[in-house]
A protein has these predicted regions:
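Alpha/beta enzyme core
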Residues: 3-170
Length: 170
């Protein structure tokens, strides 16, 4: 996943990996099964992505790390735009526990419906966040996040896992 530049800012990068071409090259040499980009990177590096023949996943939403209130990650790219860019799947983050979770769940519902009607898999990044969340990587919260992914129709669910015991239970 290469959406961290949007989400975390430049702190996750060094002189090499700040360049999307470097990431595409690593993915190609490593025979990765997919690369995940935000819309802007996918647009600007579309020729390189297509030449690499690595399946593209477009992350449809995002937020910066500058706002410290309850997390809300809004849709920034449509399923239709992702398809035009050659996406083989789309992804969307939901912060369960945030006071804004219903907004994100509703956006996901619409994305999932449109993506599936176009035979496109949907990945849900589901992270427990918000002022009421304690122990955001506990086994119970991990299992809850996985269950929500199942219930909302995600084809793949990405969660933060603290240890394998928690993952096995989830």
């Amino acid at each position: 996943a290469y959406d961290q530049g949007f989400e975390h800012g430049p702190i996750d990068f060094n002189d090499k990996n700040v360049d999307p071409n470097y990431i595409i090259d690593i993915a190609k040499k490593g025979k990765y099964t997919a690369i995940i980009f935000q819309k802007g990177i996918a647009e600007k590096y579309n020729i390189e992505i297509k030449k690499s023949k690595i399946p593209l996943i477009i992350k449809l939403n995002g937020k910066t790390s500058l706002h410290k209130e309850e997390p809300l990650s809004r849709q920034l790219c449509s399923v239709k735009e992702a398809i035009k860019l050659g996406a083989k799947a789309v992804g969307y983050t939901i912060y369960i526990g945030s006071i804004h979770e219903t907004i994100m769940l509703k956006e996901f519902e619409n994305i999932q419906r449109e993506a599936h009607s176009n035979n496109l898999p949907v990945i849900a990044w589901i992270y427990p966040r918000g002022k009421g969340i304690k122990g955001k990587s506990s086994g119970e919260l991990l299992a809850y996040a996985c269950r929500i992914g199942l219930e909302i129709g995600a084809d793949i669910v990405k969660v933060h896992c603290s240890d394998t015991k928690d993952l096995k239970w989830a």
